């Protein structure tokens, strides 16, 4: 019997007293029980968010609660990742175990960059004082994020876990829950549908997702899926701290670096669209009426919170551009440079900023983004033109002589007549290829611009290299090699 997989759940909390119970009840009552739940109170200033979190932590031994300074969604989620990565050492504040009480810890690490004040855990979790003194983070197999104003269907985890076998990500769909006084126009649009409309299979590879990304040019992902924790740790994927739109960078990295993604076409999370949202389909932090505490300094420069948020949104895109440039140095396939960086720059391309109202000096990134975006737009236009004119790298490889010869051999080896007449079919393929080559050289003599560019210049070059692993290509290559050495008996060595 398979060991039951452990799922780590990370829930950031900020001023959500109205919604938090519904969220946490959906976790407590999951049909799949083997959960380890991290609540991160991100400096809530309302009356009850922290108290509700403490109440659930006391009741459920699977919960642990971190209380920290306000730093935004990214910092809160990163606390969860770092806890499960066993990066934290704990020091007891509580020395003696009392039944049905909260045990308090503080961090024993030298650094405490997120300014974690205290950590709480139910005393009922600990069998004895020795366990209390040696408390460590649990091992988990998978990780999932949940925002504290959203809630799961009760079978959410049970649907995901069996489908995690052999993939890095299970990606599922979501319901939209509109608040009564919400002004946003209702629609059925979701990221899942946007990317997966018409796909019949359950599992896709990262390249298939990337093909869609190239057309759509934007993507976001955090809470609509489950992720293999070893994969997340090994790839060192975390959230960018102190920015809006955290799901953009995180989502791209999770999907781009993955191998296989399971498409779970079920709506098993309820995504709440709140009435005080200032911008649509942006990070949940934009839905707060007041500025988060860590953005207080912007009120010195901007009279309206809305203007401050717009400025900070531009700063967030600028930080992503900066990080993408840094990460591109380690990306051998140049996917970040060719696809992700231009899409980030697109967000800043038409933006201008008042130099006197730029406390974070993002003007330089906006100007840089304009240059990059213009450059890539020109390159993209050339790629489209070249593809229309020159075809694709895949087509080029399929039109090579070795591929055509191998294909001829495979097709005609299925019948006795085909095998008997194989030499004639191969000769015919060879002569047709030579005729095509002759016509091609005549064309480029008249018009040199029709000369095919090097294969490496095609946007699908890396993917096209897989075609050289096809049996057709390999058979044809062996046949051509044997013809080259026929005078040494090469033909008789042909397998």
Predicted regions and their residues:
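Nucleotide-sugar donor-binding/catalytic module of glycosyltransferases
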Residues: 1-295
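C-terminal subregions of glycosyltransferases and related glycan-biosynthesis enzymes
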Residues: 272-400, 404-411, 415, 452-458, ...
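Generic detector of short, well-ordered, non-transmembrane alpha-helical segments enriched
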Residues: 91-92, 228, 250, 267, ...
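Generic recognition of stable, solvent-exposed alpha-helical segments in well-folded globular domains
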Residues: 15, 22, 155, 312-316, ...
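Generic detector of ordered secondary-structure context
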Residues: 72, 219, 224, 263, ...
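Alpha-helical membrane-targeting segments
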Residues: 406-435, 476-495
């Amino acid at each position: 019997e398979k060991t039951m997989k452990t799922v780590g759940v990370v829930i950031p909390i900020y001023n959500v007293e109205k919604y938090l119970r519904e969220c946490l009840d959906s976790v407590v009552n999951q049909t799949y029980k083997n959960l380890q739940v991290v609540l991160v109170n991100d400096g809530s200033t309302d009356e009850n968010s922290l108290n509700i979190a403490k109440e659930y932590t006391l009741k459920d031994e699977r919960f642990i609660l971190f209380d920290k300074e306000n730093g935004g969604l990214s910092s809160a989620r990163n606390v969860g990742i770092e806890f499960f990565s066993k990066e934290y050492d704990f020091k007891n504040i509580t020395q003696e175990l009392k039944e049905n009480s909260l045990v308090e810890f503080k961090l024993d690490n030298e650094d405490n960059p997120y300014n974690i004040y205290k950590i709480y855990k139910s005393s009922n979790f600990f069998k004895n004082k020795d366990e209390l003194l040696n408390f460590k983070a649990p091992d988990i197999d998978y990780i999932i994020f949940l925002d504290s104003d959203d809630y799961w269907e009760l079978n959410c985890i049970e649907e995901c876990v069996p489908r995690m076998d052999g993939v890095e990500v299970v990606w599922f769909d979501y319901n939209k829950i509109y608040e009564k006084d919400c002004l946003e126009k209702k629609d059925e649009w979701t990221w899942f549908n946007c990317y997966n409309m018409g796909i019949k299979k359950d599992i896709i590879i990262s390249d298939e997702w990337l093909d869609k990304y190239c057309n759509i040019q934007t993507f976001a992902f955090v809470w609509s899926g489950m992720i293999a924790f070893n994969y997340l740790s090994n790839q060192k994927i975390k959230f960018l701290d102190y920015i809006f739109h955290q799901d953009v960078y995180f989502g791209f990295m999770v999907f781009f670096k993955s191998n296989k993604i399971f498409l779970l076409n079920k709506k098993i999370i309820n995504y709440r669209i709140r009435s005080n949202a200032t911008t649509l389909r942006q990070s949940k932090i934009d839905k707060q009426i007041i500025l988060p505490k860590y953005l207080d300094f912007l009120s010195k420069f901007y009279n309206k919170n809305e203007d401050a948020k717009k400025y900070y949104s531009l700063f967030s895109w600028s930080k992503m551009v900066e990080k993408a440039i840094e990460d591109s140095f380690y990306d051998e396939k140049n996917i970040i440079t060719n696809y992700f960086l231009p899409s980030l720059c697109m967000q800043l391309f038409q933006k201008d900023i008042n130099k006197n109202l730029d406390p974070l000096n993002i003007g330089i990134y906006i100007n840089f983004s304009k240059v990059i975006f213009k450059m890539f737009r020109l390159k993209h236009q050339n790629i489209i033109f070249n593809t229309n004119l020159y075809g694709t790298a895949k087509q080029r490889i399929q039109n090579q002589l070795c591929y055509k010869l191998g294909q001829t051999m495979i097709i005609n080896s299925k019948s006795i007549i085909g095998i008997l007449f194989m030499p004639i079919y191969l000769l015919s393929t060879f002569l047709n290829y030579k005729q095509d080559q002759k016509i091609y050289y005549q064309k480029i003599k008249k018009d040199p611009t029709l000369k095919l560019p090097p294969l490496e210049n095609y946007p699908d070059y890396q993917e096209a290299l897989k075609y050289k692993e096809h049996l057709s290509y390999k058979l044809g290559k062996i046949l051509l090699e044997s013809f080259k050495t026929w005078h040494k008996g090469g033909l008789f060595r042909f397998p």
